[in-house]
Amino acid sequence: MHPPYTAPATEEAVTRVIEFFENLSPADVATIGQFYAPQARFKDPVNEVVGVPAIQGIFAHMFEALEQPRFVVTGRVVQGQQCFLTWDFLFAFKDFHKGVTQTVRGASHLVLDAQGQVTLHRDYWDAAEELYEKLPVVGALMRWLKKRANS
């Protein structure tokens, strides 16, 4: 059995989405509709929304809450109308550990329509290890629980 054919247009659409996210700035949030279908679904460990305005809200909040957030795509697999991306999300907290670059490693599953727009964006990352352990009070508790579970 052969894998589904991946049209060159899908490869090009994925490349455009990657370039968009790797160069995302606060001003670019308003242009998300150029890459996402109107009723696109977005889900990650802390959000689940439908529609371009709601997706824009997630990324606008990211820029409000964090210093210099940016994505670096480290790998991609495109098959048919889907792709799977691995990435590093780099940022600094505004309220504590100021100026210290944090990294969250994760992956995204994207499904594109015939026009090359994202209809499903599902992010996978370990909220406990990648985020909560880096927070002052919660982080100490998470690290203690992890240590107890591993002993």
Positions of predicted regions on the chain:
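Exposed alpha-helical structural elements
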Residues: 12, 16, 31, 54, ...
